[in-house]
């Protein structure tokens, strides 16, 4: 049995013009309909809000997508930008990449900007929260995937999520030695970190409205 009548509670809050925040529990590529099937969960991400609490998608005013400054995955499934070298190990260790529920180590790779753009569009994301940018502190170079060298068109890859043989194409950016850790004002970030963020916005087609610079709540830059 349910603890209470959530649908009625939500409608009462709506009628009272209260702000309501819903939080998705999975990554977009684990969505049963839009993800890398069959390596998915049994539920939908954004669509699950309507099914779970009985509100219309038109009632959602703003959707924030959360992405790390690099890409991770737990368990099996295609991962075009996965790193099998020392850099992958470095990201995993510095980022503390262990599955919160399973305890399994996460696979790590460079940020997949192409998939970020694809899933931001399909999920109706209005703004991005970019986390763990501090994990990239101290690297001489950082990369972002902009697309793939594949026999299939990008449209076909998106439609089927057949990413097993996709070879990533990257842009390489200057890294930074000046730390971003703990910074709370965007203007106080170093030039290269700002450039990285701007490239994420350009490639994903979505503004970065929040930036996490550490594990604590106060380690956050709010731009909007």
Language-model features and meaning:
Residues 1-224:
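Non-transmembrane, aqueous-exposed alpha-helical and coiled segments at domain scale
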């Amino acid at each position: 049995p349910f603890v209470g009548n959530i649908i009625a509670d939500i409608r009462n809050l709506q009628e009272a013009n209260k702000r309501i925040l819903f939080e998705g529990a999975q990554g977009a590529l684990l969505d049963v309909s839009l993800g890398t099937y069959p390596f998915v969960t049994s539920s939908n991400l954004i669509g699950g809000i309507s099914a779970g609490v009985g509100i219309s998608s038109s009632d959602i005013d703003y959707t924030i997508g959360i992405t790390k400054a690099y890409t991770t995955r737990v368990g099996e499934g295609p991962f075009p930008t996965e790193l099998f070298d020392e850099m992958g190990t470095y990201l995993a260790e510095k980022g503390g990449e262990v599955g919160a529920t399973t305890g399994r180590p996460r696979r790590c790779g460079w940020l997949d900007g192409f998939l970020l753009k694809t899933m931001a569009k399909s999920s109706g994301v209005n703004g991005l929260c970019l986390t763990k940018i501090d994990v990239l502190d101290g690297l001489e170079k950082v990369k972002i995937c902009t697309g793939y060298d594949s026999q299939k068109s990008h449209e076909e890859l998106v439609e089927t999520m057949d990413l097993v043989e996709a070879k990533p194409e990257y842009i390489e950016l200057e890294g930074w030695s000046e730390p971003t850790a703990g910074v709370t004002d965007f203007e106080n970030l170093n030039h290269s970190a700002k450039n990285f963020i701007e490239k994420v916005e350009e490639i994903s087609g979505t503004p970065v409205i929040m930036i996490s610079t550490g594990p604590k709540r106060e380690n956050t830059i709010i731009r909007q």
